[in-house]
């Protein structure tokens, strides 16, 4: 039976978590449990592998990190719930589950759509622009990297954050794209990452066909230190 481990990492620097994802993916084997990492990042712009420098409109003192996920430039900051999914797609296929990379993208989008629905909000994906939108405004960005049939990176869901830095970029490469966040639609006391993240996780693992007995998230597990094995 596959196990899915959920780790709550709090607020962590982007580059440190990114390199830990790479190490985890490169060193896992066919018996390694899949994992979800929940994290918030201090202010940072990340440029995807297809990113074009002209989408950074106004250089600021916010660092820009060239990363290996798919997609263009986006912004991360505290109050944005990031959910990284480290899933062995190859193993799921070997077990008879017809899960493609496109299916994983859809699962990420739908877990956000379903989370929004929990709050009575109608969100939707766009076939030509990955992510989740509300009335044309983007509330969630996503980007993945697949290495040897295993995923890393994931989604970034705007919950209760300062959206101002998005004005310095063409978010995800789209000029004039307006961003939004959960706080704009519900009481601020409810728009908190620690309240939203369990909903995201539950919808995601249900969509992928995990069951409650497979999930180690009744208590969130901290990531181990860099000096020990993840």
From Swiss-Prot:
A biological process term (GO) from this entry? protein modification process
Pathway, per record: Protein modification; protein lipoylation via endogenous pathway; protein N(6)-(lipoyl)lysine from octanoyl-[acyl-carrier-protein]: step 1/2
> Catalytic residues per the record?
172
The enzyme's first-digit EC class, named in words, is transferase
Identify the EC number(s): 2.3.1.181
Keywords, ordered alphabetically? Acyltransferase, Cytoplasm, Transferase
What Gene3D superfamilies does this protein's entry cite? Bira Bifunctional Protein, Domain 2
Q: Does the keyword Transferase apply?
A: yes
Q: Which residues form a coiled coil?
A: none
Annotated catalysed reactions: octanoyl-[ACP] + L-lysyl-[protein] = N(6)-octanoyl-L-lysyl-[protein] + holo-[ACP] + H(+)
The organism's superkingdom is given as Bacteria
Instruction: Quote the subcellular location field of this record.
Output: Cytoplasm
Any one cellular-component term (Gene Ontology): cytoplasm
Q: Which NCBIfam families match?
A: lipB, PRK14342.1
**What extra comment accompanies this record?**
In the reaction, the free carboxyl group of octanoic acid is attached via an amide linkage to the epsilon-amino group of a specific lysine residue of lipoyl domains of lipoate-dependent enzymes.
Annotated family: Belongs to the LipB family.
Which purpose does this protein serve, as stated in its record? Catalyzes the transfer of endogenously produced octanoic acid from octanoyl-acyl-carrier-protein onto the lipoyl domains of lipoate-dependent enzymes. Lipoyl-ACP can also act as a substrate although octanoyl-ACP is likely to be the physiological substrate.
What is the recorded name of this protein?
Octanoyltransferase
| Species for this entry | Actinobacillus pleuropneumoniae serotype 3 (strain JL03)
């Amino acid at each position: 039976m596959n196990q899915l481990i959920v780790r709550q990492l709090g607020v962590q620097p982007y580059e440190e978590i990114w390199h830990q994802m790479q190490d985890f993916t490169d060193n896992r084997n066919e018996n390694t449990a899949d994992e979800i990492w929940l994290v918030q990042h201090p202010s940072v712009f990340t440029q995807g592998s297809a990113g074009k420098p002209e989408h950074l409109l106004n250089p600021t003192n916010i660092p820009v990190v060239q990363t290996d996920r798919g997609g263009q430039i986006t912004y991360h900051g505290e109050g944005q719930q990031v959910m990284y999914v480290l899933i062995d797609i190859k193993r799921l296929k070997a077990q008879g589950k017809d899960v493609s990379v496109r299916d994983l993208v859809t699962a990420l989008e739908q877990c956000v759509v379903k989370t929004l629905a929990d709050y009575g909000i109608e969100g939707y994906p766009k076939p030509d622009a990955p992510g989740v939108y509300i009335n044309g405004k983007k509330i969630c960005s996503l980007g993945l990297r697949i290495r040897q049939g295993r995923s890393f990176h994931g989604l970034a869901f705007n919950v209760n954050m300062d959206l101002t830095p998005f004005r310095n970029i063409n978010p995800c490469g789209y000029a004039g794209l307006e961003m939004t966040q959960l706080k704009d639609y519900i009481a601020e006391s409810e728009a908190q990452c620690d309240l939203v993240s369990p909903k995201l996780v539950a919808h995601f693992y249900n969509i992928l066909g995990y069951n409650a007995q497979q999930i180690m998230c009744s208590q969130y597990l901290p990531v181990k230190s860099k000096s020990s094995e993840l």
